[in-house]
Amino acid sequence: MEINRLRLNQYRSYAALDLRPGPGINAIVGDNAEGKTNSVEAVFLCAFGRSHRTSRDAELIMRGCAGGYVGAELTNNTGSHLIEIKLRDGERKKIFIDRQMASRSGELMGLLNVVMFAPEDLSIVKEGPAERRRFMDMELSQTHPAYYYSLQRYNSALKQRNALLKEPDRIGPGMLETWDEQLSALGEEIVMDRCEFIDGLSTIAYDLHKSITGGRERLEIVYEPDIDPEDPEGIYGAMLKALDRSRAEDLRRGFTTAGPHRDDIGIALSGIDVRTFGSQGQKRTAALSLKLSELAFIREIKEEAPVLILDDVLSELDEGRQQLLMESMKDCQCFLTCTSLEGLKRAGLGNMKVFRCKGGEMLPE
């Protein structure tokens, strides 16, 4: 899978950009605040239909302009495709796939598979459960597009139930029960997909981490669902029971306290919870193992390598971890941002396509 051409118009710091990346490593070099991350953000936008940095599409439009455009020509194992995203200030963005307007952003899922690794990805390990749920949701949406729609419907039903809980005077007979049944049916689909995902990921992560640490540490990744998937009543029955049991508490607090929106991933090193007790170095290594596992998982499920984005991340890793990362991306198209080529050359990345980013322009060397 690779992007053959990336076009930006009035997007962030770029009045116009027509980038023709190579199939291997594409190094985007420039000083801080020159727009390197803006270019890889556009790749992420084409994969997921949203930015990884902001939920406000208006921020993606170049300052002083009424609209913006992102277009990516790509090739995957189904053929050649064109993804276009048109932005207008004050309007919903429009997504086009092969020149046909998509009715929803979910139609993008799985068309352009992307794995992004940036310094903030340490939050997968060191922040709260919401970051780890986001990690699961992003990868499952790419490898199992039906999951994306189940999650969207679940979140919509959850929003409706929470709105009722905030205004108990509006609750009529059977109203909460209706939402409980919807949440339980959709929650069952989500929990089953997450179980399967973590089962596959944990095996890959264990082997990768063993390689990174020379066998000194064992990385254990476990799914920590809020609803027990092994309950004798099944996931659907267990969730109905949990929602009924927590109803008084939900009414008191004004939101739903049980369900997969409260799931987590357990991350342990040799039996020690790295989320709470790990050093910065251990958290960084665990995050790297998770990202490399994600890369391998998508490659296995989709039967082709995803596009890899490394946004100013090599400087965060020591030489050994850099080398492991380089080995893992041999068959990937990679967009790599950095302030200098020196570290890349030391890592043995002499054969790459280099683009210089400065003053709203990006030129090949």
Named regions from a protein language model:
Residues 72, 333-340:
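Structural recognition of the conserved hydrophobic beta-strand(s) that form the central parallel beta-sheet
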Residues 123-124, 130-177, 181-184, 189:
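Long, charged N-terminal accessory/stalk domains
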